[in-house]
Amino acid sequence: MIRQERSTSYQELSEELVQVVENSELADEQDKETVRVQGPGILPGLDSESASSSIRFSKACLKNVFSVLLIFIYLLLMAVAVFLVYRTITDFREKLKHPVMSVSYKEVDRYDAPGIALYPGQAQLLSCKHHYEVIPPLTSPGQPGDMNCTTQRINYTDPFSNQTVKSALIVQGPREVKKRELVFLQFRLNKSSEDFSAIDYLLFSSFQEFLQSPNRVGFMQACESAYSSWKFSGGFRTWVKMSLVKTKEEDGREAVEFRQETSVVNYIDQRPAAKKSAQLFFVVFEWKDPFIQKVQDIVTANPWNTIALLCGAFLALFKAAEFAKLSIKWMIKIRKRYLKRRGQATSHIS
């Protein structure tokens, strides 16, 4: 019985030893397979790990370099956007300070009859007549003729000198510009103590406004203060071609100005010698063309365009700042990840 028990115990021990050997062989084979996968030895494995870490390092460096370049580019774009904002605001302020003059023309069929204020002094009005296109030849120069003009006489104090009283003859001017209506006036000056003889005149915008004015004296003083005066000489026929200019002031009021072109023709005096002592004056008033010139200052600065440019510039600034912020965070994250992997590789090698 004792031998039988010993034989069974030996058999169990031998079976356990066989299992241990088999397990050790399997472990050795697994180690060999792992060694085969990793490489022929320990040193080649370390070389591959160092090579992969160097590749990762080079990629990280390239990414960091490109990130820095992008940050500089966006900083440059931010500087350009700031400069554009500054220039936009500066240009807008300059355009507000210096408006551009705009000139337009309005065609009319007829004008309001202008007022012609004449200051003949000692000269006598011989004739005043409306004609169309052509002035007929003079029949009796130096003698009183037809008076078919609407005239008014007024005396008022000179607005520039309170001691001088001026006497003005107000004549209704032409209206029908398309029919080439004109007004022909003839004056005679018998005697004059002056070396040169001339008659002053000024033009104002509306003869009807003068008639309807409750204070005609003040009206004429205001006209003389606002409008320029001209002269026409004796012994000539002075042809005045008028044009009207309306200027819009900054406060919204509209100022009226007359511009004129004059042509002077010598009068061939064929009167007897006894009558030539009296000086004759001839003047013609006519509209130059049917166009009223309108002048106004226009501010070319458009606030909506400026606002749109500013919004675009500020949007570019915010986007650039946001991208720079994200790029910096990404660089910090990549740096931390690289340091972490490097520490893990060092601990694994050790």
From Swiss-Prot:
Changing K336N: In a breast cancer sample; somatic mutation. The keyword Ligase does not apply. Pfam families: TMEM206 (PF15122). It catalyses: chloride(in) = chloride(out). InterPro entries: TMEM206. Glycans are attached at N155, N162. It is found in: Cell membrane. Residues 86-301 are extracellular. It is a multi-pass membrane protein. One of its GO terms (cellular component) is chloride channel complex. GO terms for molecular function: pH-gated chloride channel activity. One of its GO terms (biological process) is chloride transport. N-glycosylated. The keyword Transmembrane applies. Widely expressed, with highest expression in brain. Residues 1-64, 319-350 are cytoplasmic. The chain crosses the membrane at residues 65-85, 302-318. The modification Phosphoserine is found at S9, S14, S24. The modification Phosphotyrosine is found at Y10. Chloride channel gated by pH that facilitates the entry of chloride ions into cells upon exposure to extracellular acidic pH. Involved in acidosis-induced cell death by mediating chloride influx and subsequent cell swelling. This is Proton-activated chloride channel.
